[in-house]
A protein has these predicted regions:
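C-terminal substrate-binding subdomain of Rossmann-fold SDR/epimerase-dehydratase oxidoreductases
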Residues: 1-108
Length: 108
């Protein structure tokens, strides 16, 4: 719901440039995936491949990336005057519940 509010506020503003909207909490992709698994209550495992296995599967070396991702919302805060207030985990839980509701409606 905060993403919707942020988008609505942006649309109501006079600002015309690109902005980031998201959690400012730094999180690794594996941790984000594990968070989604934990919220869902499903019995899933994360499997990463690297080294020779990655090379064999994709034909090039495994890319080296950053340790985590987060959103820098400073420009949004400056131009729109609003910022995210709920933790990433809470937003993910609400999103998962909303998705479940949509799936249940579709399956009726």
């Amino acid at each position: 719901d905060e993403c919707v509010e942020a988008t609505y506020r942006l649309m109501q503003s006079d600002f015309m440039g690109p902005v980031n909207i998201g959690s400012e909490e730094m999180i690794a992709i594996n941790d984000f995936a594990q968070m989604a698994i934990d919220i869902s209550g499903k019995d899933l495992s994360i499997y990463n491949i690297d080294g020779q296995d990655f090379l064999d599967k994709y034909g090039h070396k495994c890319p080296i990336g950053v340790n985590g991702r987060n959103s820098d919302n400073k420009l949004y805060q400056e131009k729109i005057g609003w910022s995210v207030s709920q933790p990433l985990l809470e937003g993910m839980k609400k999103t998962y519940e909303w998705i479940l509701e949509q799936v249940e409606k579709e399956n009726k």
